[in-house]
């Protein structure tokens, strides 16, 4: 990377993925970074963040793990080489529930409040990284000349310039909209109308068929109704064949006197529909309390503790994207792949982040993975302002296959959690084994292998 011409990088989106990317990239003295956040303050939007083995390891590889470890008591710092029980699954749509399996994973599952996460990392941004709030991206202008800067436009009417744009701006990403509109226009001009239509269809997220009704419930109230409730021993998912599932787990708080309870209503016949705004809204809970009449007492007890009003979340997702890069613009995190549950926490998206303990391995996984690979590529000494587009092509080439796997695996596991396949649900032992197997890639696939693949391509093409 040429020292006499620094690469100006704009990171749009101040969620976990954007912050990690900015920190990792800013370690190079040959870049200048502007980090833009749409909200009035970093960490203002979103609940807690879940972190299993893979993102925890990536933070260590990036030299950032210690900042978060300082927030934890010594006995709660994850051990990367220890397998621990993480989530317990039960079939609960009957008078006496049945255990399905207990998911185990390396290092377990660590949670942080979003505000604590940002407070721990943001002070370590060096002087070559400037931060801005109340800057919501509207679009960017793709330059006709490779040497000209990218112009980005914000909702307040201001503009900025950069050499590289990193869109970490969530599932409703304006970066993705601009990128895929440019690609579609190009295909249209070349007479490829079907391709243009397909590209435009990838811009807007579609309904997954899952609505989540979320509530924070009192641990004291639940203990009075069910003193031996499974949720007090281990985060638990109660599953039912009526396409319903309910995770219940202690919420991240200073005194742990509350639990997060969520009721998932799954109708996969609606998968792929356009879901009207807003995706998140408050609704009355009275109908939910009577929605599990034949379920085991523990499940009914948890629902009975929900408040009068609950938050309804429509889980929307993206169809697989064929590329995460165009020109000198890349997509990161939910802007590139928004997976359905159960792999959808530690999200960079502001409107759609679910801090559910049932959602095991996604990074919570993907934004960190993306930031890790992108930073390793762009901080390679061979990358310059003149060849940075070729470097970004490598990022897309490496990340798309892995991200597509996560998307597909997430969908399969989400359906298993909803007992969607009645044949599979009839054999609980086999179902549990299948669900566990769908998750093991999250700690068996080493992120350093993906880094090696990326850097080998940099050496091959740019050196």
From Swiss-Prot:
FAD binds at residues 37, 50, 114, 334. It is an enzyme of class 1 (oxidoreductase). Pathway: Mycotoxin biosynthesis. The structure of strobilurin A was used for the development of the major class of beta-methoxyacrylate agricultural fungicides since its beta-methoxyacrylate toxophore targets the Qo site of complex III of the mitochondrial electron transport chain and prevents adenosine triphosphate synthesis. Compounds such as azoxystrobin (Syngenta) and Kresoxim methyl (BASF) are among the most widely used fungicides worldwide. This class of antifungals are used as effective treatments against a broad range of destructive fungal plant pathogens and make significant contributions to food security. GO terms for biological process: secondary metabolite biosynthetic process. Its EC number is 1.-.-.-. GO terms for molecular function: FAD binding; monooxygenase activity. Belongs to the paxM FAD-dependent monooxygenase family. This is FAD-dependent monooxygenase str9. It comes from Strobilurus tenacellus. The gene is str9.
């Amino acid at each position: 990377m040429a020292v006499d011409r620094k690469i100006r990088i704009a990171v749009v989106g101040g969620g976990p993925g954007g912050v990690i990317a900015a920190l990792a990239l800013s370690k190079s003295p040959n870049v200048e970074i502007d980090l833009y956040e749409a909200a009035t303050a970093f960490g203002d939007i979103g609940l807690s963040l879940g972190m299993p083995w893979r993102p925890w390891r990536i933070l260590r590889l990036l030299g950032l793990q210690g900042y978060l470890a300082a927030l934890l008591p010594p006995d709660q710092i994850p051990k990367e080489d220890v397998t621990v029980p993480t989530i317990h699954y039960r079939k609960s749509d009957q008078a006496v529930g049945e255990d399905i399996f207990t998911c185990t994973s390396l290092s377990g599952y660590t949670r942080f409040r979003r505000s604590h996460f940002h407070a721990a990392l943001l002070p370590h941004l060096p002087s070559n990284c400037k931060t801005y709030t109340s800057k919501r991206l509207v679009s960017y202008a793709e330059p006709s000349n490779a040497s000209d800067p990218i112009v980005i436009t914000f909702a307040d009417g201001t503009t900025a310039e950069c050499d590289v744009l990193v869109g970490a701006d969530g599932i409703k990403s304006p970066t993705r909209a601009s990128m895929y509109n440019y690609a579609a226009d190009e295909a249209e001009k070349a007479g490829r109308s079907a391709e243009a239509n397909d590209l435009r269809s990838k811009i807007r997220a579609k309904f997954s068929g899952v609505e989540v009704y979320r509530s924070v419930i009192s641990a004291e109230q639940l203990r009075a109704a069910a003193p031996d409730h499974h949720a007090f021993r281990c985060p638990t998912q109660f599953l039912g064949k009526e396409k319903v599932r309910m995770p219940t787990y202690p919420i991240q708080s200073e005194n742990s006197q509350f639990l997060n309870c969520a009721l998932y209503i799954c109708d996969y016949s609606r998968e792929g529909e356009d879901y009207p705004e807003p995706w998140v809204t408050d609704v009355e809970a009275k109908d939910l309390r009577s929605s599990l009449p034949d379920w085991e007492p523990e499940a009914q007890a948890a629902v009975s503790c929900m408040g009068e009003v609950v938050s309804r979340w429509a889980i929307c997702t993206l169809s697989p994207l064929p590329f995460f890069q165009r020109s000198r613009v890349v997509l990161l995190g939910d802007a590139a792949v928004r997976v359905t549950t159960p792999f959808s926490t530690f999200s960079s998206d502001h409107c759609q982040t679910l801090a559910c303990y049932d959602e095991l391995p996604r990074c919570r996984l993907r934004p960190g993975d993306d930031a890790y690979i992108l930073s390793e590529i762009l901080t390679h000494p061979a990358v310059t302002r003149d060849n940075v587009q070729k470097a970004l092509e490598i990022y897309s080439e490496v990340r798309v296959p892995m991200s597509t796997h996560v998307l597909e695996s997430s969908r399969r596991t989400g359906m298993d959690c909803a007992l969607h396949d009645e044949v599979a649900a009839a054999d609980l032992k086999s179902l549990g084994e299948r669900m566990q197997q769908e998750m093991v890639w999250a700690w068996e696939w080493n992120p350093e292998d993906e880094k090696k693949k990326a850097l080998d391509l940099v050496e091959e093409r740019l050196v």
